[in-house]
């Protein structure tokens, strides 16, 4: 937290917030040089030792290692794993199977702290900081909006599980179907079309109810517009928010993509499967994940299963019955986005970044 705050303060001192195109840390690197910028950030961070915003001072391991990257060969990766279902086990065993990664080369152990929708409270953040101090380990943020605790031993895992339970971060969810990633969407983004976080929550609910939340080997990502902040284009199941028109009314909708993946020295963008009303998107996920879980063979990836199941277009034909809008009188909920109370309107504001500048 101290490093993050130091970066923000350094940018506030030396960065340019008046010009959107240059309101980026990369421009400080370009004009100041990475070595000079790093030195100023570290200087700012040391100043925070006495700051009330970071109780307890800076952990010794942070001072010792600074901002050095993890280094090749030590990063945790779940690519290429065998999809599994882990129902019917005790809580610790389920957590171990889903959220613990063991390094084959160097014998290291890493454990994930699960953050539903990437949300974390102040108490949880400070709890993670205390775990870092107590065990002298690295804690890093992942691109799936969770935290990974690195440098653990096998003997420490039961204790770590109990500590994470205290902060409600022990749920087995990492790399499982329930680990849905979403951009902020219309909650806070001026150029978002739909409430992508609301859809992510609805998908999680639907998967839980269908008993499919702990199906492994499938990643679900959502963006609230055509931009790729939610990385929907490189996920097994991706959604991008769009405006739909039905019965003379605007309604929230999504374009569903299938088959995107990144890993094993290759990348593939998801292909269009079908368009859906926002309120039918969760059911489409339940159908696809359920079909994948029941039909896959041992070790088969989602993309391999999709390839032998007719591809995105083939699977999309099985979902066409969901692309139906009832009239506003029959079901007005179809014309109101998640977490909203009034009729849907695709209002696009001024971008806060350089995306549309």
Where are these regions (language model features)?
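Peripheral terminal and linker regions in Fe-S/redox and tRNA-modifying enzymes
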Residues: 1-357
């Amino acid at each position: 937290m101290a490093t993050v705050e130091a970066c923000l303060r350094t940018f506030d001192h030396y960065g340019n917030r008046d010009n959107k195109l240059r309101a980026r840390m990369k421009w400080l690197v370009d004009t100041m040089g990475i070595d000079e910028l790093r030195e100023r950030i570290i200087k700012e961070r040391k100043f925070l030792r006495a700051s009330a915003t970071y109780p307890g001072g800076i952990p010794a391991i942070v001072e010792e290692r600074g901002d050095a990257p993890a280094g090749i060969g030590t990063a945790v990766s779940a690519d290429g794993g065998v999809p599994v279902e882990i129902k019917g086990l005790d809580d610790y065993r389920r957590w171990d199977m889903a959220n613990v990664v063991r390094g084959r080369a160097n014998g290291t152990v890493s454990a994930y702290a699960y953050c539903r929708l990437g949300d974390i409270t102040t108490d949880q953040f400070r709890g993670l900081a205390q775990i870092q101090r107590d065990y002298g380990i690295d804690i890093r943020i992942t691109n799936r909006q969770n935290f990974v605790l690195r440098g653990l031993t096998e003997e420490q895992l039961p204790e770590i599980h109990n500590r994470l339970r205290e902060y409600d971060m022990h749920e087995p969810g990492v790399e499982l179907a329930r680990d849905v990633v979403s951009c902020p969407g219309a909650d806070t983004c001026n150029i978002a079309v739909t409430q992508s976080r609301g859809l992510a929550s609805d998908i999680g609910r639907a998967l839980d109810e269908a008993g499919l939340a702990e199906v492994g080997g499938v990643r679900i990502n959502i963006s609230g517009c055509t931009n790729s902040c939610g990385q929907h284009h490189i996920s097994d199941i991706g959604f991008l928010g769009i405006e739909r028109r039905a019965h003379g009314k605007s309604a929230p909708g999504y374009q569903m993509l299938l088959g995107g993946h990144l890993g094993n020295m290759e990348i593939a963008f998801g292909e269009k499967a079908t368009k859906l009303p926002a309120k039918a998107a969760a059911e489409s996920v339940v159908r696809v994940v359920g079909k994948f879980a029941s039909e896959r063979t041992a070790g088969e990836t989602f993309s391999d299963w999709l390839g032998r199941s007719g591809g995105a277009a083939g699977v999309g034909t099985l979902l066409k019955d969901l692309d139906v809008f009832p009239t506003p009188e029959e079901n007005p909920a179809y014309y109101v986005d998640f977490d909203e109370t009034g009729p849907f309107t695709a209002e696009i504001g001024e971008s806060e970044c350089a995306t549309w500048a």
